[in-house]
């Protein structure tokens, strides 16, 4: 089967361009209606303690890429800070609540803002997708756009040939509405390339809304800091930079 070359100019490219532009527009609309990023809803002290825990985890996982002196300096600094709890956010005691008690999330003013931003994010994702799906179904229904260059099993036929009633058609042929669904699920690398955040543009963001960094509960942060400091203390450092000159010379000479 041969396809008209004009299909890629009048069907394939318009759908792809509209999908990319809609994603960019949705990103700016999300920024406008939510007012700021998700991190700004978190107190600065909470972000600081979370970042120090992340820093310690990264040092444990990637310390082999550092020299022994650099690792020892970073290890000493982090162990001292985590042990002394310099960056621990002190919870405010309200209404006679005891220290270490898990706070009620419904009393947190940031919770209502997060739920409202979640609802706004769902609307900002649902409305454009509905409009574009109607546009594709109305103007490009029944078009076969391309043939995939790799073989597929028959289970992909229903997904790739939506709107095409032809039982004998090869499963590699893709219809217009199926190309729309593929674009919805597969445009995150394109958004990353043009500088947009894939967490905000992905399908997960349309369901759950943007989320800030999630650290341990307030009552367990101090325990997590001491545990991380203990892990840093007992870790055995092995750097990949030892004898690197001899290994390079041995490989290329």
Curated annotation (Swiss-Prot):
The gene is AIM27. InterPro entries: EMC3, EMC3/TMCO1. It comes from Saccharomyces cerevisiae (strain RM11-1a) (Baker's yeast). One of its GO terms (biological process) is protein folding in endoplasmic reticulum. Component of the ER membrane protein complex (EMC), which is composed of EMC1, EMC2, EMC3, EMC4, EMC5 and EMC6. It is found in: Endoplasmic reticulum membrane. Pfam families: EMC3_TMCO1 (PF01956). Keywords: Endoplasmic reticulum, Membrane, Transmembrane, Transmembrane helix. One of its GO terms (cellular component) is EMC complex. This is ER membrane protein complex subunit 3. The keyword Ion transport does not apply. It is a multi-pass membrane protein. The chain crosses the membrane at residues 10-30, 126-146, 176-196. The EMC seems to be required for efficient folding of proteins in the endoplasmic reticulum (ER). Belongs to the EMC3 family. It comes from the Eukaryota.
């Amino acid at each position: 089967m041969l396809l008209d070359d004009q299909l890629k100019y009048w069907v394939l490219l318009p759908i792809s361009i509209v999908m990319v532009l809609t994603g960019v527009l949705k990103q700016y609309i999300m920024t406008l209606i939510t007012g700021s990023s998700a991190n700004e809803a978190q107190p600065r002290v909470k972000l600081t303690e979370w970042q120090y825990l992340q820093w310690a985890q990264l040092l444990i996982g990637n310390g082999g890429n550092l020299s022994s002196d650099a690792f020892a300096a970073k290890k000493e600094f982090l162990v001292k800070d985590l042990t002394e709890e310099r960056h621990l956010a002190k919870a405010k005691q309200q209404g006679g609540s005891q220290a270490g008690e898990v706070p009620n999330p419904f009393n947190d003013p940031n919770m209502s803002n997060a739920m409202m931003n979640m609802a706004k994010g769902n609307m900002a994702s649902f409305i454009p997708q509905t409009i574009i799906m109607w546009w594709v179904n109305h103007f490009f229904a029944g078009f076969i756009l391309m043939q995939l260059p790799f073989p597929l099993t028959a289970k992909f036929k229903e997904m790739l040939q939506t709107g095409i009633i032809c039982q004998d058609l090869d499963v590699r042929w893709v219809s217009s509405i199926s190309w729309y669904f593929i674009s919805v699920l597969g445009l995150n690398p394109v958004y990353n390339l043009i500088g947009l955040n894939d967490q905000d543009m992905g399908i997960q963001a349309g369901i759950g809304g943007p989320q800030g960094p999630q650290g341990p509960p307030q009552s367990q942060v101090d325990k997590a800091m001491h545990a991380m400091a203990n892990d840093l203390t007992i870790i055995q450092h092995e750097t990949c930079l030892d004898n690197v000159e001899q290994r390079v010379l041995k490989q290329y000479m």
